């Protein structure tokens, strides 16, 4: 029994054969063993003052701006932040959740994008404070700061219509039930064009499949989505006169593809994005 305990706790001052160690680990996995969370006495005090920030990645200034603001405000109240970039990988998110439940005594979690494990996170919110920042989701049972995707999309549509555009293309990262903001922006664009009397084909949509998306560099996921899809559209030919990126990073990719193919903005095409990150003013 003591040998099992030492192997499971990864003691370094003892020696066991690889076969013995593997048998213990396999048995623990089969039985669903989980390392017990440290007691309050065992946990160093500073950990209880840490706020975990779950974000998809830090290459998009939208998220880094939020992280900076949250961290600055947390410091005002004596808290520190721990940023967990998941690259939108569910297994990475699960790792952080398990780490928090089993090893870290955190003060709370702030989600900057939709979790892939909503039932589990809903349950965790009964034990610690959790806040979500994003589109409204009635299935969330914890605190949420709602960020509308529909309203800015309507503003974009109204602006493009006022400039004389009658057909546009919306370019997005993969559309999914979890990432609702992507489809909400498209739906709002279509609805606004229809309200002005334009047909069903007024707004076309192009997005990468999850498989294509996963092949891209994690540091350039959104930018590369905009860049690759715009080049495909232009090579195929299009009657759209404007491109709308799901966010500013996608829009940057659209711009670079247009410039590379010698198109001028706004003379040949108009380009819009969302989020209003600082780089968008350059």
Regions found by a protein language model. Give the residues of each.
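Short histidine/acidic/glycine/proline-rich micro-motifs that form metal-
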Residues: 10-13, 57-60, 87, 174-180
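Short conserved active-site loop signatures built around small residues
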Residues: 24
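DNA major-groove recognition helix of helix-turn-helix
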Residues: 8, 28
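N-terminal helix-turn-helix/winged-helix DNA-binding helices
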Residues: 29-62, 77
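Short beta->alpha connector loops
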Residues: 87-90, 112-117, 249
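Bacterial carbohydrate/catabolite-sensing allosteric modules
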Residues: 29-35, 72-80, 95-102, 108, ...
């Amino acid at each position: 029994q003591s040998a099992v305990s030492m192997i499971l706790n990864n003691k370094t001052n003892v020696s066991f054969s690889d076969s013995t160690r593997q048998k213990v680990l396999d048995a623990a996995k089969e039985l669903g063993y989980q390392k017990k969370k440290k007691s309050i006495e065992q946990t160093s005090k500073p950990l209880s003052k840490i706020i975990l920030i779950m974000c998809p990645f830090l290459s998009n200034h939208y998220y880094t701006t939020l992280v900076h603001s949250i961290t600055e405000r947390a410091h005002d109240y004596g808290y520190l932040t721990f940023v967990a970039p998941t690259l939108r990988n569910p297994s990475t998110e699960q790792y952080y959740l398990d780490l928090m439940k089993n090893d870290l005594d955190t003060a709370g979690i702030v989600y900057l994008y939709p979790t892939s494990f909503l039932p589990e996170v809903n349950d965790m919110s009964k034990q610690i404070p959790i806040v979500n920042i994003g589109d409204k989701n009635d299935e969330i049972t914890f605190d949420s700061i709602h960020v509308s995707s529909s309203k800015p999309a309507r503003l974009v549509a109204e602006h493009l219509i006022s400039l004389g555009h009658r057909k546009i293309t919306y370019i997005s990262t993969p559309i999914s039930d979890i990432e609702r903001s992507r489809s909400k922006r498209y739906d709002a664009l279509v609805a606004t064009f229809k309200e002005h009397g334009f047909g069903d084909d007024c707004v076309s949509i192009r997005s990468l499949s999850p498989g294509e998306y996963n092949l891209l560099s994690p540091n350039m996921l959104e930018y590369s989505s905009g860049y690759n899809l715009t080049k495909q559209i232009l090579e195929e030919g299009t009657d759209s006169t404007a491109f709308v990126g799901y966010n500013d990073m996608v829009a940057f990719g659209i711009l670079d593809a247009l410039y590379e193919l010698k198109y001028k903005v706004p003379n040949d095409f108009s380009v819009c994005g969302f989020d209003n990150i600082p780089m968008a003013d350059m």
